[in-house]
């Protein structure tokens, strides 16, 4: 196909006469715009080589990128590939191209477009006003000569953005890869004619890039010299914001003379530096003119303070090859070496501070070997339609290809493990299907004209559909579950409305027709936020829904230098000459400083008190050791960059082994515990081994987990509905069938969670618990209906800021907030809690109208809490240089006591040297504490505590009265049986049941008691306690006497309201539903009848509306159609009994630890004091209330003294867990450790949210970053991972769609395909928080915004219009943390300093 319209005006018909009206939508003929080769940056390996071309490539290195509309981005690409029709060598030398090197060659019947990758794209000749479309490259080439394009043409609107003289000129050509632009203007250079030249001079047989024009009419202009030795060369650029850049050029003679002068001044022998260069290279004609430096000469925003040095400078070999790149601080950041014989053929390169990578070529100029002295090396073997790649670990990969030139594609890939994947492409090289190693095929349906994906069908037959407007913008997408997102755009192609799958609508407003930056956004709640922008597109101010303003300051390079928020909070940032962040200062002047090595790796963080934390790196920038407060952790890597050994602060080691595809297959921990992993052909985990426990994992066709078996016995089962939503998880716990059922509304939002427990023998329902969720019209989850309680309604303002809480129709809690939306006053009846903050945003005080509970907080310069003062007592805290709590000094009227906390280097508790001076213990290398001052401990091979026995001091006569605690676990390492004995007699025994998510649902406790005969033995009948949950939060505790229910602050583990109901009262609330009543007496003879499920749902909804006295019009119409009234239905309902309930407010400390229970009358009904690790020190409980909540997420078990902590049990005496972290190293290096600063940090679950990064291989790196660009901005791919509830992680990120060249640097985005295991490094960014995790899982499913190559400081901030991977992950995390912040002061402070507010 030629890519020309099927019927063009002027074409002749078979029987004569021309066509008057053409069709722009259908293309005819042989393909046009086909490239001579595949894209150099497409398929790459190593550092990097394109094996399809056999070429050494560097797909993109950015030297200049200042923010603004149509910014001047100077980036370099290199390819050793040589096209047969090259353009002349550009100003960066042979093999190198920059965007301005685009050139169009005009030949008799062919147009040859030379792109900035060194390729040639071949188009047919174009008539004036005609266009050619390259389907393989998604690129339009249009010849001027008409005022308008056909109305149906995709480029019609973009064409009208051009000045009329450009549109009407038949001598100009224009190219674009998107209907949104920009246009690349291909014209000619105006020149001064020679004296004897005949005028008018003919136009040259080529066109060069003269500028860019976007859809708003903004321009970027390339200024070319009209006369002299640099005639036709670019010597200046004016970007879209009005900045002027001067490009300093040199000739070979000038460079030779400069080299001779440097040799003379340096007293050295001048090297051979010829005055001229050969006029032709393998890369095209060469005039010897090179770019020496780029200066910023005019800056409209900073006219008086221009940089005194060039933004970038280049060094050259005597043969005119690019040898070095220097950044704006004059630091050399890149160096290159070339073949002695073939000019421009790169044989080595390096980033400053990184090893040199070398390359060897065969006689045809193809790379045969890539040599890496500090990592993997590769060899390449070329055969017809087959390339074999072998690395230095002897792993072989074979690529099978079809097609030639620009249509060559990899159709089959043989992996190192022998597995094979295959791909199918259409006639123009677009992906149509992929078959994985298991033989399963995913099909892709691209649009015939645009190539945009319109449908994806997965191997299980489920499909996703995508729809676009005439300008190739996504207008709607429907997932396999039927949920849909929709987008609307204005006439300029700007997003004006987006509808999420749950129906939430976000609107965008614009006040400037020449800008794509919104002036306001409006979310689903109707809350409006406004923004103002600089001429460079930088956010200057952000006004939230309440009218509160945040202001931003920037430097000339686009970096944020200050953020000013309400309430006087400001943050200041400083940068060095390379643009690296070197200092952050808060409002109080507390400054944190940063230091870097030559490669740009962060080596030192200096805290405000001067303490230093350092990191050392290997040759590739991977951290090999970190030192904090004199304690060091180290990491070792193999040649493939995989971690193979960790060395803890104690000198103990964890080792790792991998398969040939870099998947982890064995991990041996610090204590010798070994775990092994096996994967199927597609990479899914199918078998894991853990010291005798063998788990098999089973999946359905959609790769959803269906069940697991452990040692041959079924563990959990997962069930899904037809939409793919999880509906049930079940397993057997201590013989009981335990199931969790999930219900959803029509928008896919969780509506209910129903837990059931059945008897092992009779299948009798022993326990059930349901939590329901409801959403308001704006999509906020503002209602929760706890089991057997009235609805809990959260009252909000703006975009969801909490202002109050109601239980049923009764308001209970009210909140007052400041201009930063921080809580300043909480009211509960007569109870009032006033909260104040320091100028730096830290918690300063919490004062009650009951003075005895007042608290004041004092912080040091490092942000550590050093004192809590109250009328009862004062506690002062001391820390080690690693931030660990080392001591507490408590003073009161009759008390003055110091308690030290001593740990080994890895954080394991040691005996206090003052109290136990004779102790020889200095560390626990395996992190298993075997003894302390009170007990002896034993562990099994899984590292689980199995026995704890009283320690009998030496010299004490043994009487065999020591107490022994024994712990027994199931195959999932959950405590299921506990006993405590003395004199070989049981004192207490307990057994525990769990649901398939690992949440405890019941415990049975037998205690020693005297029977009727006077004999002491365990009770025959256990005391049974049942538990109910809302996600990861324990909300219900019920025994035979009472039910206690807890309502937590939204998104946190901090309890807010306690509701206690006598069990006898609960029995009175039992009633039939309306549906049950009608079914029991609805038969023709008065007997029972079974209603269809749809009718039951309608009756349930009607009943809930009647009970709430809010019957909808829809329900009234339905009843009327049946000849019924609301009153009639109400008369059929069983009466509702409201039980007597005791309601108390939890008064908690800054961590969420309950300190008091406040009655509705404002009196203190219960009060307690704890030590820093959650041990109860004192309790005032006149009403005998049961208050078992301890540190967030913890429940006290009286029988064992342990605190149940969701995934495991916490021993408050040791300040650590009794089993290892179920997520292993993902939760930290010490698997037993609770946060070592418990007064500031909490761990409600023992899991966490991770921020992961990995290299952009296209940027040439293999470590956690690929090296800085010349102004110091690190480029790496960043994404987030959260626990998936199945013992693993699910990840999400932002990626450039990259389906065609038309996607561009600011093209459509897509969800990245990431895994936790593939990361170069993952860092903990949020301790366990189910609200954050669930919020992020929702973010992972959302359609991505448009991709931006620049970070947020260059493009819209926190608006989601343009995002690179780093900004998307940062903003998603901060948004979810904000939604889930509740009253967590520490988290709020972090928000303030990360720009969320």
UniProtKB/Swiss-Prot annotation:
Q: Where is this region: Disordered?
A: 1292-1312
Tree of life domain: Bacteria
Q: What does this protein do?
A: Rhs elements have a nonessential function. They may play an important role in the natural ecology of the cell.
Q: What is this protein called?
A: Protein RhsC
The record's listing under PANTHER family reads: PROTEIN RHSA-RELATED, PTHR32305
Which family does this protein fall into? Belongs to the RHS family.
- Region 28 X approximate tandem repeats, annotated ranges: 330-1186
Quote the record's domain comment.
Each rhs appears to consist of a highly conserved 141 kDa amino fragment followed by a highly divergent C-terminus.
Keyword field: Repeat
- Which sequence ranges are marked TM in the entry? none
Q: Where are the sequence repeats?
A: 330-352, 353-374, 375-417, 418-438, 439-460, 461-481, 482-502, 503-525, 526-546, 547-567, 568-588, 589-609, 610-629, 630-650, 651-671, 672-691, 692-711, 712-734, 735-758, 808-828, 829-850, 851-871, 872-894, 895-930, 931-959, 960-984, 985-1019, 1162-1186
* Gene (UniProt): rhsC
